[in-house]
Amino acid sequence: RDDVESRGLGDVYKRQDMTCEGSFPLGGAIAASMIAAGASPWLAIAAGAFGGLLAGIVTGILYTKLKIPAILAGILTMIALYSVNLHVMGKANISLLRVDTIFSTTASLLHVSNSVAAFLVPAVLLFLCSAFIYWFFGTELGMCIRATGYNTQMVRAQGVNTDTMIIIGLFISNALIGLCGAVVAQNNGFADVGMGIGTIIIGLASVIIGEVILGVDSFSASLAAVILGSVIYRVVIAVVLYMGMPPNDLKLFTAIIVVLALAAPMIKGKVNVGK
């Protein structure tokens, strides 16, 4: 699940998009509300992804059409989504403990335990999302989006509408994050209006860890780095919890990891200069 979320963040973190802190719980809120009302949990996942997509479009319009700075556009959407999420759920949280989810239905269908289903479902979703991303960003449209991220002025000089490319990139990334929120809500057994707090830090930690370890010299390497970084991050979190770290300190620990990873190149450069 974190791999899918990180893949979305990997597409947007260089554009300073804060929408994820709102689109993640939006996906969970939509999915939980639909499931509680008797809808299919699989349909609820699609609806959660669509909700994230709409959130990304809003941020994209604020940034490209209204010329609001990227980070502020994301923050404004994130703040607005807090109220939207409350309206979607009708309250601060929704329990899913006594209803069918994608995990319980998969366990029943394949005659496996819930723990096995909790591994299989995210693994399949990760594969499908990664395959789609690899294919899409290899198309002409996808390469235009990637080029816009690298050098907006150069792409604009080629006659490409960069505003449209940015909006498409934002709604794809936030659709992935909304999908992840829908899956996490079903796995946790509840959706909460505050479940998105710290999402961007967790995702960034996964992306940065993967990039530091593998390096990024191609698009496929970038995909692999995100997946590897997510796995390593979760292993590290499991280890520090096993060693006795209070769960309340996890966000602080994650923030420190991100700071160290971002500062490492500068520190390394100063050390080399000193030598």
Name each model-derived stretch.
Residues 1, 37-43, 105, 111, ...:
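Membrane-interfacial amphipathic/re-entrant helices at transmembrane-helix boundaries
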